[in-house]
């Protein structure tokens, strides 16, 4: 009987682990879930001032790059995938609303806390090594995502188009 209970317990742990790893990606349920693309020619405001306010070195590109933000839910967690295809960057940030997550970006550690403000997704990003904070707001209006970036008093915006089939 004891062996049966141990086997049953182990099966349950294995089944739960497999189930959580195989949870389907949910692309709907919140306005900001989905895939959003900004081409180089798409609209932006105040981008160079934002890059300067961050204190990035001059070799950092001031020009706009094709940028893709994808947000989905899988199990109990959300994922924010940031892609810059021209720079071969593809960063998957797994998060839970209201909880801080720490990631590495290049040589820097970033602390990010995502939360909702009405229908908007907000991310407060801290860069301890630089003593800087970025306040990002993801606001979906129709088939567009308007992302606002704020450092100190400098606010920049970038417009993204929603992709009809985010899994593609």
Swiss-Prot record:
Keyword Signal recorded: yes
Positions of region (SAHS-c2): 72-100
Signal peptide: 1-19
Chief site of localization: secreted
Any one cellular-component term (Gene Ontology): extracellular region
Region (SAHS-c3): 113-162
Transmembrane segments: none
Swiss-Prot/TrEMBL keywords: Secreted, Signal, Stress response
Additional note from the record: Trehalose, a disaccharide essential for several organisms to survive drying, is detected at low levels or not at all in some tardigrade species, indicating that tardigrades possess potentially novel mechanisms for surviving desiccation involving tardigrade-specific intrinsically disordered proteins (TDPs).
Domain notes: SAHS-c1, SAHS-c2 and SAHS-c3 are 3 highly conserved regions within the SAHS protein family.
Full protein name: Secretory-abundant heat soluble protein 33020
Protein species of origin: Hypsibius exemplaris (Freshwater tardigrade)
